[in-house]
Amino acid sequence: PAISLVGPVEIDEFYVSAGKKGRERDRESRSRALSKRGRGTYEGDKPPVFTLVDRGTGQRYVVPAKSADEATVRLLLDNREKESLTVYTDGFRAYDPLDDDESFHRESVIHGDGEYVDGDAHVNTCESHASLARRWLSPHRGVSKDKLTAYLRPFQLRRRIFRKPGREALKQIVREVL
């Protein structure tokens, strides 16, 4: 589904272990210990997945990406209806350039400093949605990073029809599928 943002918007990222499921490996199997410091990368079989929550409409989006950088963040936030969009983030450095852009009003919380909520600024909805997405992916016991979108689309649909009455849920499913 296309991302359409009214605002204000929460955005957060999480990383999923997703490799080359169903294809030949070009290296030895990875060890179970933490081998590298830092965040995951698409090339390192731990692609970033962005969670966006539009507080204005209640819509939630889960979008896998090749990289977690400023360009990706700008691309995700580009489909907005208003000129200036309020964005709630955590302290991840890819969101820092939004402070200098007049198209965005950024408010952030720094988890590293023990700050999780500051007035309306929090990303708790994104984090809870990311937790549900991880639970959704876990029974698949390994996901191909190239097909991560295909695994997350049914999750988004399921969350969209959650607690809707039968007919309304069925109409939503038909609209999404067609």
Feature names for model-found ranges:
Residues 1-178:
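Residue-level recognition of single "structural anchor" positions
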